Amino acid sequence: MDKLLRRVRMAEGMVARRAQRKNALLKRITERKQNKKNGEAFTEAIQQRKAAVEARNEDWMLGPLAPRRELDEITLSNGNFFGSLSPTRALLESEVSEEERKARVAWCGSPKFLCIAPGDRVVVIEGHHKDLIGTIEKLNTRNMTVEIQSEKLKTNTTVPQFMQNDADKPVTQIYARLPISSVRLVHPLKDPQTGEYRDVIIRELRPRNIVHDRPTRTRSMRRFVPGENIIIPWPKQEPIKREDQPADTLRIDVDEKTFVPTLFRPPAPQQVLDELRNKYSIFRTRHTPEYIAKKEQEEQEKEAKKSAAKAMLTPVQEYNRKQRELRRARGQPALTEEMLAKIGEVVARNKLGHHQAPKVKEETVAQIEKAVEQLSLGGGQEDAATTTSPEQPKVV
C-alpha cells in the first residue's frame, strides 16, 4: 500500500506542477496582450497629440487654404476619423494595477467595500467636464470607472471595421467613462441654520456595519461620512423584472421532494459505482479490502524472494550461524560467589596501591646499600679512579 500511496502523491505533485506551468503561461500571455493593448492606447494618444499640433500649425500657416479634416476620411496617423476616439480610450478599457485601483477608490472605501453604486448622483471635479452633475449609469469594478448619464459626456467614437454594417455610420456617440477618483458623491443634507435641504459634495466615505449573509452569499453594509457621523442611504434599486417562459420550471415542481436519502440502499446502483469513482484512476486513495489484501500478499511474496538468497550459505557460514545461535541461547554468563570475591580482592588491592608510594626493587636497594658502605670505608683504588670529584662520587 505504501507504493500505491507514493504513486498517488507523485501523480498529484506532477499534476500540480503541470497546472502551475500552465497558469504561469496563461498569465504571461494575458500580460503580453494587456501590455500590447495599453501600448496601443498610449501610442494612439501620442499620435493624436502630434496630429493636433501639426493641424494647428497648418491652419495657422495656410489660412483659407488649410485642408478640411472633418470629411469622412480616416486619419492615417491613428486610424480614427477626425474628432473621434477609439472605443478603448473612450471606455478606459486599459488594465490597471491593484495599486491604481486602490488609489482610484481611496475616497470611498476600498475595492472590496465600495461605497458608491449605480444610481448615485456624482459631480465631476476634474477634466473638461468639471462641475458636471449626473447619475451613475454603470460601474466597472475591474478598472474602477463609472459611466455617467449625461449628454455632455457623449464622445464621438470610431466604430471598428468588424462591427460596421452597410447602413451604420463609421462614427457613433457613446458615454465616455471616468475614473472614480475624478468624481465625488452629491447628496442632499439638511442645513442646521436654515433647516432647508441642499446638495452637498461628499468628499470622503467609509463603510460601516458590514454583515455577511452566508445562506444567500450576500453582503450588506452602511456608508457614512467620517468625522460627521452622517449615514448616507443607498440609492433605490429597481427590481429586476423577469417574464415567465414556457420552458421555466414551476414552483410547485421545484418544492416537490423527488428523492429521499436512506441508509438501506446505496446512493447509486452498484454497477455504476466504479464508473463514478473512476476505479482505475491514479489518484484513487480508497480501495476495497480484497484489493488491499491482494497488494499486501504481493509485497510479502517480493520480500520472500529477497530473503531466499540468504538461505544459500557455505558450510563455514552455517557453522558460524549455529555458534551464534548457541551463544544467544546460553545468554549472558552468571558470576559465582568465588568470582565476585576474587574481583573484590583485586579492586581493593588496586585502590590500596594508588594511595601508597611506588615500591623499589630489592636488587636496587642492595646495590645502593653496598655503594654507601664502600664510601664510608674510604673506597678502593678502583673506586677512586672512577671518582670525578671528592664531593660527588660516581656510582656504577
From Swiss-Prot:
Annotated Polar residues bias: 384-396
Pfam family name, one: Ribosomal_uL24m-like
Domain of life from the UniProt record: Eukaryota
InterPro entries, A to Z: KOW, Rib_uL2_dom2, Ribosomal_uL24, Translation_prot_SH3-like_sf
GO biological process, one term: translation
Disulfide bonds: none
Matches recorded under SMART domains: KOW
GO cellular component: mitochondrion; ribosome
Record localization: Mitochondrion
Gene3D superfamilies linked to this entry: 2.30.30.30
MF GO annotations: structural constituent of ribosome
Subunit (UniProt): Component of the mitochondrial large ribosomal subunit (mt-LSU). Mature N.crassa 74S mitochondrial ribosomes consist of a small (37S) and a large (54S) subunit. The 37S small subunit contains a 16S ribosomal RNA (16S mt-rRNA) and 32 different proteins. The 54S large subunit contains a 23S rRNA (23S mt-rRNA) and 42 different proteins. uL24m forms the wall of the exit tunnel.
Family: Belongs to the universal ribosomal protein uL24 family.
Protein's job: Component of the mitochondrial ribosome (mitoribosome), a dedicated translation machinery responsible for the synthesis of mitochondrial genome-encoded proteins, including at least some of the essential transmembrane subunits of the mitochondrial respiratory chain. The mitoribosomes are attached to the mitochondrial inner membrane and translation products are cotranslationally integrated into the membrane.
Protein name: Large ribosomal subunit protein uL24m
